[in-house]
Amino acid sequence: MKRTTKTIFIALLILNFFALNAYGLSYDASNHYELENVIIKQMSKYNPDFNIKYTGSLDNIEEVLKNTVDKNIYLKSNISEVHWDLSSTKHVSYINVKVNYIITQEERIEADKKIVEILTDIIEPYMNDHEKAKAVHDYIVLNGKYDENKLYYSDYDLLMEGTSVCNGYALLTYNMLSKLNIPVKLISGTGTGEAHIWNMVKLDDYWFHLDSTWDDPQPDIGTISYSYYMLTEKEITKDHTIDENQDIPKSTKKYYDYLKELSHDKLLAETGLDMYNEENTAKNESDLISILKRKILYHPLRISIRFDKSISQSSLESAMSKLAINDYISQIGYSPIVSDNTGEWNILNLYIKYKETPEKITLDFAKN
């Protein structure tokens, strides 16, 4: 479930002749700052071919041109190729920029329209930013499918085709949250050693890492994971690395702790973070069976439990088989066992399908 990035090819030709034969629109820039602004503005409009009459210094010009794209992750994520041609005389230079985007301007407009329609459907007036962010995350995970063939790269693809690599997941998360005025960033790096991209989201005063791609279980069985939902930097970097030279906000507040402070019991249960509560931590097989029996009474779509590392795989399977005897359950699946954020316990994430959808999915706030 990792992203395959498209390499940005930059061809810089410094040619010593006066005029540049070009077909795109022309803009003026007299210094590096103005040059960057022109490039960013035109790329933000998905302009595929434009010219710049540049009268500033040529010192480090190749680095300036390359870094303009590299340091703007949103632009870089929407581009497949960039070609720069530069010709110069003693006092003026002409730069032609040709760009191949992963979508067209028309597709961007269509995607934005679709995003507004979706948000109108999934966002309620009473929701706070925590609930809005979760609604966006859940929509993307439930309606998206990771593109194993690596043919689709954009949020437009994820919206219209229902599939994309991580670039599309991260872009759709970015664009949906941005329209809700929730601060959000794109973060580039690696996931288990492969090029990857995800998001950071600011909720109230705190920034968190959010990887909607890795929260979409594979194979796609119509379930939602929250294993990479609102993590600290320490938590995300267990299997992600962050590219250098990015403006990364500090992220040290554990989302579980913050939801406890806010008394958001409903969100704790819905995201499975209530597994950190004492009553949802299994010290032995008997505890595990007891917790599962209690939780299944509320017909959840997902059950998350912390359990002692001494509990064997056969004990886990035995406990899960006892759930399967309930005749209203059609399917039980679980994600790979991982350690919790303390490293001292393991986590069991169960995904449950019912033969009939309950009229109302209730949540377990009960205490033993």
Where are these regions (language model features)?
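Hydrophobic/aromatic-rich core segments of domains that either
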Residues: 168-236
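Residue-level detector of well-ordered alpha-helical segments, enriched
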Residues: 91-94, 132, 136, 169
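Sec-dependent N-terminal signal peptides of Gram-positive bacterial secreted proteins and lipoproteins
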Residues: 2-24
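Secondary-structure boundary elements
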Residues: 103-158
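N-terminal accessory/pre-domain segments preceding catalytic cores
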Residues: 20-127, 237-368
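Catalytic cysteine-centered active-site loop
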Residues: 147-153, 163, 184-194
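Periplasmic OmpA-like peptidoglycan-binding domain that tethers envelope proteins to the cell wall
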Residues: 158-167
